[in-house]
Amino acid sequence: AFWAAGVLWKIKNEAFMNEYKWIDDLNFKVSYGTQGNSSIGDYGSLGLIGATTNYDTNASLVYAQHPNPELTWEKQKMFSVTLDGKLFHRLDFELMYYIRKTTNMLMGVPYPYTTGYSSLVRNVGGLQNSGIDVKLGYDILRGRDYYLRAGINFNYNNDKVTELFQGRQRWEIANTLVAYVVGKPVMYYLPIW
């Protein structure tokens, strides 16, 4: 089960804000919640047998998917603090700081080739993201039946691998330019020949 909770303070409704007529709206929000990622398919945990004709054009049964009974949802916990509002009847803004921690990350873990598989999706590893989001919007023209609006978004995200599988501190995914290193961001790398 996943859940979330939040608190909103409508600062503009406070008595001390009455003298600031140029501030149309001002809110402060804090939220915390959990969510999951179920990108494992409907039968991702089951051992499956399938038919093939790859051997001398004769039909045969093969192990199509290795059983993975411990496979479960990836879990995320997220905390955010947001300040948003509207100024001068035209300019709106939102500033948000967030921290998201992912555990039981779904990753293709290397598997012995003697099994007939090169990897198996497992719940291993952890990742932490933190950063800020800034959104600005401005109503350039506003009529009864039309409006022209401009907006801009800015995001800064800092990600860090917190845990890998089998006690590893580094893992380079074969045939890609992606590496996971504990304590570092998920990164692209170029090998030196």
Residue ranges, per PLM feature:
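Basic, gly/Ser/Thr/Pro-rich low-complexity segments located predominantly at protein N termini
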Residues: 38-41, 130, 136, 172, ...
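Short loop/turn motifs that connect adjacent beta-strands in outer-membrane beta-barrel proteins
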Residues: 12-26, 90, 141-148, 161-167
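Membrane-embedded beta-strands that build the outer-membrane beta-barrel scaffold
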Residues: 1-11, 26-32, 79-85, 91-99, ...
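Outer-membrane beta-barrel signature, preferentially recognizing the C-terminal barrel domain
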Residues: 45-46, 52-93, 120-143
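Generic "edge-of-domain/loop-turn" microfeature
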Residues: 12-16, 37, 50, 102, ...
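Conserved small-residue
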Residues: 122, 139-193
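Alpha-helix capping and helix-loop boundary segments enriched in small/acidic/polar residues
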Residues: 1, 17-18, 71, 124
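Surface-exposed extracellular loop regions of Gram-negative outer-membrane beta-barrel proteins
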Residues: 23-71, 99-123, 163
